[in-house]
């Protein structure tokens, strides 16, 4: 009897220990799953990843690229990210030639660019704001009026209900993605008559803000109180109106690669993993851009 009781006690103890062991394994697995989910949400972090990543292109994407660059390098201290702001056309040429890893473009890619093996990776949506100096009494235009201003048919603000003042039409240089998108969306490609063509978003913002009678266009995310953003067809340039499809002037922010993302090196793939993570998406929203639907 004593031997039987002893055997039962041993079996019970063993069963308890096995249950605890399996429970422990289950907890460890759940923890690993949770950690994996957390890692995916926060973006790829790899201290062993080392090397360099090069981007070039759109000046309109500077604010976004600098924010992503800083946060990505914090998570991946072994990687050096460099970005050159050379204009959308130049960025696409560079990635096509293989001289950079990623070409930044603030417009959709052309069929010819895609035919050269360049992949259009849309990372954000931006609005193009039409701006004037703060002393201008005209605060909204129809899209038809805007066309006529930039094609030279309307040259004085008095024709639009404003004061007798010459309109100074400011635009971007020919290779600019902002200009390409603006002219395409307005259907005035190669028809515009610019008083000045400037080579960066910041230059347009500064010139319009300091020039009486000036009008220009810039990325929505760089707007500040030095200029006034105009309503177009009665619609304000806001994220809500762009998402709702109400605002005419919106365009994609593209990080183009030569070939698909899964064909790229580990650093490029890690970059896009981060951009598409919850943390990366939060960075995109923080700089005033809209997430692709």
Where do the protein language model's features map onto the residues?
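Sec-dependent bacterial lipoprotein signal peptides
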Residues: 1-23
């Amino acid at each position: 009897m004593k031997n039987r009781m002893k055997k039962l006690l041993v079996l019970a103890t063993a069963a308890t220990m096995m249950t605890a062991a399996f429970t422990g394994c289950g907890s460890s697995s759940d923890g690993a799953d949770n950690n994996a989910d957390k890692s995916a949400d926060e973006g790829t972090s790899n201290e062993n990843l080392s090397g360099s990543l090069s981007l070039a292109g759109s000046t309109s994407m500077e604010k976004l690229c600098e924010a992503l660059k800083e946060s990505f390098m914090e998570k991946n201290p072994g990687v050096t990210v460099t970005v050159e702001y050379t204009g959308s056309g130049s960025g696409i040429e560079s990635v096509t030639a293989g001289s950079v890893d990623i070409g930044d473009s603030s417009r959709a890619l052309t069929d010819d660019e895609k035919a050269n093996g360049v992949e259009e990776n849309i990372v954000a949506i931006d609005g193009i704001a039409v701006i004037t100096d703060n002393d201008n009494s005209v605060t909204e235009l129809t899209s038809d009026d805007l066309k006529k201003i930039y094609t030279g048919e309307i040259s004085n603000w008095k024709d639009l209900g404003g004061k007798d003042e010459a309109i100074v039409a400011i635009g971007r240089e020919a290779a600019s993605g902002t200009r390409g998108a603006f002219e395409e969306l307005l259907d005035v490609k190669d028809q515009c008559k610019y008083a000045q063509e400037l080579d960066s978003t910041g230059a347009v913002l500064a010139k319009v803000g300091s020039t009486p009678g000036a009008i220009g266009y810039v990325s929505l995310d760089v707007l500040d109180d030095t200029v006034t953003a105009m309503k177009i067809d009665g619609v304000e340039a806001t994220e809500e109106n762009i998402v709702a499809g109400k605002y005419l002037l919106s365009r994609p922010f593209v990080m183009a690669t030569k070939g698909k993302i899964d064909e790229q090196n580990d650093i490029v793939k890690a970059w896009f993993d981060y951009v598409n993570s919850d943390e990366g998406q939060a960075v995109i929203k923080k700089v005033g851009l809209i997430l692709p639907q």
